[in-house]
Amino acid sequence: MLDATPKEIVERKALRINPAKTCQPVGAMYAALGIHNCLPHSHGSQGCCSYHRTVLSRHFKEPAMASTSSFTEGASVFGGGSNIKTAVKNIFSLYNPDIIAVHTTCLSETLGDDLPTYISQMEDAGSIPEGKLVIHTNTPSYVGSHVTGFANMVQGIVNYLSENTGAKNGKINVIPGFVGPADMREIKRLFEAMDIPYIMFPDTSGVLDGPTTGEYKMYPEGGTKIEDLKDTGNSDLTLSLGSYASDLGAKTLEKKCKVPFKTLRTPIGVSATDEFIMALSEATGKEVPASIEEERGQLIDLMIDAQQYLQGKKVALLGDPDEIIALSKFIIELGAIPKYVVTGTPGMKFQKEIDAMLAEAGIEGSKVKVEGDFFDVHQWIKNEGVDLLISNTYGKFIAREENIPFVRFGFPIMDRYGHYYNPKVGYKGAIRLVEEITNVILDKIERECTEEDFEVVR
């Protein structure tokens, strides 16, 4: 399929081939689904909304509910004010959400639609029923990525909902970043294991990983409740897990409600999870329970067991910046080498963090690229191969062409099932990652070894 990819590398400035990202509204829609009884609303054409819902549904194998302003030629010329006002009336009448979270698209951004004014006009006209809410964020698709869109929606949540009443609630806010519902469940489990009260926002657990009960619910049981979102302004601290996806919301909350924040890496791997657990302990004075220490010990034990197959292995990684920063560190902890590290999301701090990480580990000769794509990585691999590729589903074409062991990681994963129930964060998530990484390497060894080396025990 990719046999025509040339080995000779030509510098590209204005072209992306097989990008390692998707557009802002996907992330904004995902964040909005993490609000209880919320209907995400795409202010643009029907095609945009359909695509964004499809990407999420293909990844989670669950329906991603959302509405649209349904732009046609008229709205494309005169603006979408009339469309969204009609849409909001219809949505509350037909679907009765507690809150509508509006995000923009390329078209409405190019037109310059003034959403705060539209929302204010709807409030004045009584189009928003008493006790209901409409919030918004701006997510132009031609800037940033789905991670940027997630961050912008979190900022919108804070701008519209967070309140400081002056009465502290004794809780810690946690903004989990662009991670899956299983990861959010795992983060909450660690809070609960340490008996620490918290507010996670947004929270898609129970929304995009819910059970089949035989009864359809347009708004599942999960998601952060509106009263909790308002209460985030009374918390003692906000933990921002991943600077790209979470810092914007944490900084906005600090500025608006004077809630201090601390930025941590996404807790993937040993050191990043250690930092997360210790941050909880230091912020609350709570001791780390023996159950969590046991999980850490199990992870270390597995890393030692697998070390002979991972030491010195060269790895190519592509994905979202917060996850890839943490995963690159974990790859180093496993004794392997992050040879090629790429994100499609803009922001040079990614390059700085990875470069510093590699320098600290004494690793030379690696390539790191911001706003890179799968074509970059494929060409690099053609010139100097790797032992393992870690990326979303789209990496499978490179893995097939170059016969490289492949671990699916990140977003989207559209060709496998069950991954959305398995966390990658925390010590439990890291155990799962070591298992996947080691086993795909062993699969290749056993697929290609001689009959004499085809061992029963490894």
Swiss-Prot record:
MF (Gene Ontology): ATP binding; iron-sulfur cluster binding; metal ion binding; nitrogenase activity
Origin superkingdom: Bacteria
Residues that coordinate or bind [8Fe-7S] cluster: C23, C48, C106, S141
Enzyme Commission number(s) from the entry: 1.18.6.1
Cofactor: [8Fe-7S] cluster
Catalysed transformations (reactions): N2 + 8 reduced [2Fe-2S]-[ferredoxin] + 16 ATP + 16 H2O = H2 + 8 oxidized [2Fe-2S]-[ferredoxin] + 2 NH4(+) + 16 ADP + 16 phosphate + 6 H(+)
One example of a Gene Ontology biological process annotation: nitrogen fixation
Cofactor note: Binds 1 [8Fe-7S] cluster per heterodimer.
Record's keyword annotation contains Transmembrane: no
Enzyme class, UniProt record, top EC level: oxidoreductase
Cellular component per GO, a single term: molybdenum-iron nitrogenase complex
UniProt cross-references to PROSITE patterns, sorted A to Z: NITROGENASE_1_1 (PS00699), NITROGENASE_1_2 (PS00090)
Keyword terms, alphabetized: ATP-binding, Iron, Iron-sulfur, Metal-binding, Nitrogen fixation, Nucleotide-binding, Oxidoreductase
Keyword Transit peptide: no
Recorded family membership: Belongs to the NifD/NifK/NifE/NifN family.
Function per UniProt: This molybdenum-iron protein is part of the nitrogenase complex that catalyzes the key enzymatic reactions in nitrogen fixation.
Subunit architecture: Tetramer of two alpha and two beta chains. Forms complex with the iron protein (nitrogenase component 2).
UniProt name for this protein: Nitrogenase molybdenum-iron protein beta chain
Organism lineage: Bacteria, Bacillati, Bacillota, Clostridia, Eubacteriales
Gene name per UniProt: nifK
